[in-house]
Amino acid sequence: MKETKITYKDAGVDIDAGNTFVQMIKPLVKATSRPEVLADIGGFGGLFSLNMGKYKHPVLVSGTDGVGTKLKLAFLADRHDTIGIDLVAMCVNDIIVQGAEPLFFLDYLATAKLDPAKAASIIKGVSEGCVQAGCALIGGETAEMPGFYTGDEYDMAGFAVGVVEREKIIDGSSITVGNRLIGLASSGLHSNGYSLARKVILEHMGLGIDDQLPGLGKTVAEELLTPTRIYVRSVMNLLRDFNVSGLAHITGGGLLENIPRVLPNGCKAVIKKDSWDVPEIFRIMQKAGNIEENEMFRTFNCGIGMVLVVPEKESEEIMIRLSGLNETAFVIGEVAKCDAGKECVDLV
């Protein structure tokens, strides 16, 4: 009796599919390239030559993140071409809050069975995000792990590295009482709060992924899969000409948890709730889920994706510049004195 020969493909890992995928994404990767990139993808590591002549004391800033359960909605809608934008946004928006220019990005994609076309669609979004952020996609890892994930599901992680002059690191230490808080509009939920959003919209409201959201004129998929905004170019533009004392990326924890991360001791943020237009999706969820206001501001960005802390005397010029950059911005509050043991954010 002839012995059966077992291959890696029989075990669920298709090396040929992986090679096909790499060839499919090469043009997408090339579209993100910068002059400092020294090699194409496919090597064991990405090579990036930092131009030391541009800096006096360069400091590298790194960040890593994922997109959480927003992926579940991508699975339901079978839409995968924008989720990569979210991945890049979550990472680069984190490192620009310290004043760092994003230089390069790497991604990790894990799935039970690799579908080259779907994976290439995902990387299309990653490439688009890198183009928006001005950083190069220099490498990544695609892990095919049979039996580890359910059906066609996958998970993603991203890794960004940027650079900032040591003397220009933004750490919030120069924030003072009287500084103004400027909020940059979000595009929707971005990539946080989706576990609660799914519970309210899919379970409590009983809507399907292709159903219309009442009063929005959009389907659940269209609204909830809107890509996270990437603020890199606007923020870097401001940093060249203005004093920005602090920056907060409004992610998990919302305004209530993220703004305090950049405030020095003795300071609090006073936020005027009626100073910006809260997108309707947040009002729909709050009403349908009977969600308390504090819970909304502690879970979602509520329409503000990035907060700048700036000197009062520069706030007007900064708002004018932001308008010229096509940013929708609002003066949402100010920094005030905070007594020890008190809350760091007041909603008024």
Swiss-Prot record:
Listed SUPFAM superfamilies: PurM C-terminal domain-like (SSF56042), PurM N-terminal domain-like (SSF55326)
Main location: cytoplasm
Enzyme nomenclature, EC number: 6.3.3.1
Keyword Manganese: no
GO terms classed as biological process: 'de novo' IMP biosynthetic process; adenine biosynthetic process
Listed name of the protein: Phosphoribosylformylglycinamidine cyclo-ligase
GO CC terms in record: cytosol
Protein source organism: Citrifermentans bemidjiense (strain ATCC BAA-1014 / DSM 16622 / JCM 12645 / Bem)
Catalytic activity: 2-formamido-N(1)-(5-O-phospho-beta-D-ribosyl)acetamidine + ATP = 5-amino-1-(5-phospho-beta-D-ribosyl)imidazole + ADP + phosphate + H(+)
Listed pathway(s): Purine metabolism; IMP biosynthesis via de novo pathway; 5-amino-1-(5-phospho-D-ribosyl)imidazole from N(2)-formyl-N(1)-(5-phospho-D-ribosyl)glycinamide: step 2/2
MF-aspect GO terms: ATP binding; phosphoribosylamine-glycine ligase activity; phosphoribosylformylglycinamidine cyclo-ligase activity
Family according to the record: Belongs to the AIR synthase family.
Protein localization: Cytoplasm
Pfam families in alphabetical order: AIRS (PF00586), AIRS_C (PF02769)
Record's keyword annotation contains ATP-binding: yes
Domain of life where this protein originates: Bacteria
Taxon lineage: Bacteria, Pseudomonadati, Thermodesulfobacteriota, Desulfuromonadia, Geobacterales
Gene designation: purM
Keyword annotations from UniProtKB, A to Z: ATP-binding, Cytoplasm, Ligase, Nucleotide-binding, Purine biosynthesis
